Amino acid sequence: MARTGIRIKGPRAASEELHEAIIVGGSYAGLSAGLQLARARRRILIVDAGLRRNRFVSQAHGFLAQDGRSPDEILHDARKQLLEYGTVTFLRATATEAAGSMNDFRITTDRGDSHRGMRLLLATGLKDELPAIPGLDERWGTTVFQCPYCHGYELNRGRIAVIATGASAYHHAAMVADWGEVALFTNGAVDLDDEQERHLKDRGVVIERERVLRVSGATTIELRDGRSEPFAGIFTAARTSLASDLASLVGCELEDGHFGQHIKADRFGQTSVSGVFACGDGTGMAGSIAVAVSSGATAAVGLHRSLVFA
């Protein structure tokens, strides 16, 4: 197959080409969806801003045959393979506007380009919003994490801190206890009942109610009473928000999840708007590459069927 490469358009260019699908978001879910649609010989445009959610992470884990690889390398290889299909165009840009209806959607980018598509697939992801504790942001993805399946094993059963952000901290701490010796810092964010406390203690979790002042060094937690506690790693459940407002712009219904709003979609990615599909973290899926890839592939099947049976 002839490789298409990355299409470069001049400023304020407008394309009247009608793509069969426009995918907004070229990370794991978006590229996975693109691959399925390319293999169905559909003409697709992928628009990606290059701000994947796990861009702070140096190694990816839990993804079959890719365990321990750099997320950048995984994406590079995926994009290279996808662009071997002659019906695929990739555009490095941020989609800023979206409008339209079934068979005639239009997106506009920050470059001034506009593009038309019969279907729209949103793989725009989420933004993480960490607790306002000094030292957390700059360590996010290196020594501060959310997913123990992605990062717990490498802590070698060392001491692990879980900083509460809400009621989910009980479940978070109980789960993380399989990866090391856990201290749960309630930080005024969660009230544990007697049964929860008993369960956590049975799991070997130490409950610490003193407020967290800051994180220093690699993974040292400094408390308001002056104590400092070193850890192998820190877990916390970030609040999330949609990384793009395109879903709202085209009228998609949103719903509340455990950590923030996400796009409401059925198991094949169909949103509340006919012809608009969604996949990946932005639909409330667990934040892992493996789950994102699965979500993208499944949404692509739903989108493809809608083209066939419209």
Describe the role of every protein-language-model region.
Residues 34-35, 170-172, 279-310:
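A conserved FAD-binding loop/helix module that cradles the flavin
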Residues 132, 138-154, 240-290, 298:
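FAD-site-proximal beta/loop scaffold in flavoenzymes
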Residues 19-73, 158-159, 164-190:
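Beta1-alpha1 glycine-rich phosphate/pyrophosphate-binding loop at the start
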Residues 4-8, 129-167, 171-174:
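Glycine-rich dinucleotide-binding loop and its adjacent helix/turn
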Residues 42-43, 49-51, 58-85, 146-147, ...:
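N-terminal glycine-rich dinucleotide-binding loop that anchors FAD/FMN and/or NAD(P) in oxidoreductases
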Residues 76, 82-109, 114-117, 180-261, ...:
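A Rossmann-like FAD-binding core segment of flavoenzymes
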Residues 1-19, 76, 85:
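Extreme N-terminal leader/targeting segments of oxidoreductases
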